[in-house]
From Swiss-Prot:
Record key words, sorted: DNA-directed RNA polymerase, Nucleotidyltransferase, Transcription, Transferase
Annotated Gene Ontology cellular component terms: cytosolic DNA-directed RNA polymerase complex
Catalyses which reaction(s): RNA(n) + a ribonucleoside 5'-triphosphate = RNA(n+1) + diphosphate
Function: Promotes RNA polymerase assembly. Latches the N- and C-terminal regions of the beta' subunit thereby facilitating its interaction with the beta and alpha subunits.
Enzyme Commission no: 2.7.7.6
Record-given protein name: DNA-directed RNA polymerase subunit omega
GO terms under biological process: DNA-templated transcription initiation
Amino acid sequence: MARVTVEDCLDNVDNRFELVMLATKRARQLATGGKEPKVAWENDKPTVVALREIASGLVDENVVQQEDIVEDEPLFAAFDDEANTEAL
């Protein structure tokens, strides 16, 4: 596989700072298993995969910022009111 260059990525990102921030966020998503890669992994590190996705135009800031909405229990469902009123 050919190397990914900064110039390849800058075709899809405005500047180097945004590239670093985008690649960092995407690499973290890939490393923690939060998201599936959009390109073949090919035994690369998450950072390289993130840069390859950016260079291919498959990932941008909108894709990285999308969070999966998970239906969960209410925020204070496990909060025990009786235990707190006894403490007062």
